[in-house]
């Protein structure tokens, strides 16, 4: 054991709780949306994709981590490490890029930067495909030699190798690529879209350009997506910050808990995203009941 055995027991219990809540609530989101035709809107397609990404994290990542925490180290070998790292990374990236597509959808619908443009089912499907392409573009390279997945923190889960400059893996270039393309760029797009969106909502309210009912509906949807983005940032920024610090200070002495805490804090979006969706979407709640 790298740390007190009680820490592994606590980690296993935490992962069990995430699975116990995360699987049913994401599966319920998928089932209810597919079961009720009126929920099959372009916006909800993207939210469905978010649930699929969360299920990848729950089934491919959380279950593995719970099992290995019971043994005190990663017992599943190189193949298991690659699979766990791949599914956890893919799920997280699909969720992030789904939030990017949601932000763009909100910007187009509310701000109307393109006159007479309507966000349709085809556009939503293109957004879904884009999120998967970007997710795979981040999760696949470590499987084929550009960086690698290694056990991290308390050695019960696997992630991208921020820690070493292992010869032949080009870890430095991949980490820089990942931080720029798969973190800074999507966050910049999200902040731009919501900055414009908030301005447009205030201007519309002041000018009374749309009916009160339409304004209220757009505000509710926008509020739901903004809360999802804030929640995502609260969970992922600590992990990204610690990972970048480790990358920039390789060779520094830090304990296994230092990376473990932000890593497992970052797994909570798999639970709260569908909870936000259910709590703030009246139509979905009615269909669920």
Swiss-Prot record:
Pfam families: 7tm_1. Phosphorylated on some or all of the serine and threonine residues present in the C-terminal region. The record marks 84 as: Plays an important role in the conformation switch to the active conformation. Glycans are attached at residue 171. A motif ('Ionic lock' involved in activated form stabilization) lies at residues 105-107. The keyword Oxidoreductase does not apply. InterPro entries: GPCR_opsins, GPCR_Rhodpsn, GPCR_Rhodpsn_7TM, Opsin, Retinal_BS, Rhodopsin. The chain crosses the membrane at residues 8-32, 45-67, 82-104, 124-144, 174-195, 224-245, 258-279. Residues 1-7, 68-81, 145-173, 246-257 are extracellular. Disulfide bonds join 81-158. CDD domains: 7tmA_MWS_opsin. The keyword Phosphoprotein applies. One of its GO terms (cellular component) is membrane. Residues 33-44, 105-123, 196-223, 280-289 are cytoplasmic. Keywords: Cell projection, Chromophore, Disulfide bond, G-protein coupled receptor, Glycoprotein, Lipoprotein, Membrane, Palmitate, Phosphoprotein, Photoreceptor protein, Receptor, Retinal protein, Sensory transduction, Transducer, Transmembrane, Transmembrane helix, Vision. GO terms for biological process: absorption of visible light; G protein-coupled opsin signaling pathway; visual perception. It comes from the Eukaryota. GO terms for molecular function: 11-cis retinal binding; G protein-coupled photoreceptor activity. It is a multi-pass membrane protein. It is found in: Membrane; Cell projection, Cilium, Photoreceptor outer segment. Its main location: membrane. The modification N6-(retinylidene)lysine is found at residue 267. Belongs to the G-protein coupled receptor 1 family. Opsin subfamily. Photoreceptor required for image-forming vision at low light intensity. While most salt water fish species use retinal as chromophore, most freshwater fish use 3-dehydroretinal, or a mixture of retinal and 3-dehydroretinal. Light-induced isomerization of 11-cis to all-trans retinal triggers a conformational change that activates signaling via G-proteins. Subsequent receptor phosphorylation mediates displacement of the bound G-protein alpha subunit by arrestin and terminates signaling. This is Rhodopsin. The lineage of its organism: Eukaryota, Metazoa, Chordata, Craniata, Vertebrata. The gene is rho.
């Amino acid at each position: 054991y790298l740390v007190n055995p009680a820490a592994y027991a606590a980690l296993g219990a935490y992962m069990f709780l995430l699975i116990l809540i995360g699987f049913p609530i994401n599966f319920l989101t998928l089932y209810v949306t597919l079961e009720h035709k009126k929920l099959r809107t372009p916006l909800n397609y993207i939210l469905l994709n978010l649930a699929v990404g969360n299920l990848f994290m729950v089934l491919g990542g959380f279950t593995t981590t719970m099992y290995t925490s019971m043994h005190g180290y990663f017992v599943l070998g190189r193949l298991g490490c690659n699979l766990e790292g791949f599914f956890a990374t893919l799920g997280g990236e699909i969720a992030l890029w789904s939030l990017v597509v949601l932000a763009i959808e909100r910007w187009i619908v509310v701000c109307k930067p393109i006159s007479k443009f309507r966000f349709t089912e085809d556009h939503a499907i293109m957004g879904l495909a884009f999120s998967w392409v970007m997710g795979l573009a981040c999760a696949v390279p470590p499987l084929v030699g550009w960086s690698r997945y290694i056990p991290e923190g308390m050695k019960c889960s696997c992630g991208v190798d921020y820690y070493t400059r292992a010869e032949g893996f080009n870890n430095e270039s991949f980490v820089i690529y990942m931080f720029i393309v798969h973190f800074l760029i999507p966050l910049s797009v999200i902040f731009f879209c919501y900055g414009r969106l908030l301005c447009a909502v205030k201007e519309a309210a002041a000018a009374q350009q749309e009916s009160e009912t339409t304004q209220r509906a757009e505000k509710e949807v926008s509020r739901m997506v903004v809360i999802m983005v804030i929640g995502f940032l609260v969970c992922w920024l600590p992990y990204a910050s610690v990972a970048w610090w480790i990358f920039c200070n390789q060779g520094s002495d830090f304990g296994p808990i230092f990376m473990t805490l932000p890593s497992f804090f970052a797994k909570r979006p798999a639970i709260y995203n569908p909870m936000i969706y259910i709590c703030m979407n009246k139509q979905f709640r009615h269909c669920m009941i």
